[in-house]
Amino acid sequence: NVDDPGIIHDADTPEDYAELLRAHNQSLIRSEIHIQLAREKVFFDEQLYSLLTLIQETGSVRDACEHMHISYSTSWNLIRTLESQLHKPLVSRSQGGVNGSHSELTPYGEEFLKRYARFSEETRNCSEKIFENCFRGFFNA
């Protein structure tokens, strides 16, 4: 008696294959870690990491907001809260002019993002190892 649907069922059509893939993916269990930084309250999370990364890539807070579907005022509130918690500016702003306004991360902001990315990656790697040690073979039993 075989319990593997990949052996029992044909995958001759795209629909059959899609169903097998759906069943396989549904059977995968993994841990999910969300990294946040806090003092009394959370002041930095993955959403703000994405916002700052987009500001650096686009050179524009407004463009970053459009990509993330958040309001311009919300983004500035998040940035101001972060900067007040770290006591340093992370985003430098230049006003209008011929080429319009421009924003970019300060050197401190760039270093902060690098360190957060490293911390996040190392935390996820440790979490995966711990998850594997705690649950290896458990869900397949």
Positions of predicted regions on the chain:
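Conserved alpha/beta core of the MobA/IspD/sugar-nucleotide pyrophosphorylase nucleotidyltransferase superfamily
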Residues: 1-30
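Residues within the DNA-recognition helix of helix-turn-helix
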Residues: 78
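Short helix-boundary/capping micro-motifs
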Residues: 58-64
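Short, Lys/Arg-enriched N-terminal segment that forms or immediately precedes the first helix
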Residues: 27-40
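Helix-turn-helix/homeodomain-like alpha-helical modules used for DNA recognition
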Residues: 110-141
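Basic, amphipathic "hinge/linker" alpha-helix immediately C-terminal to the N-terminal HTH DNA-binding motif
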Residues: 93-118
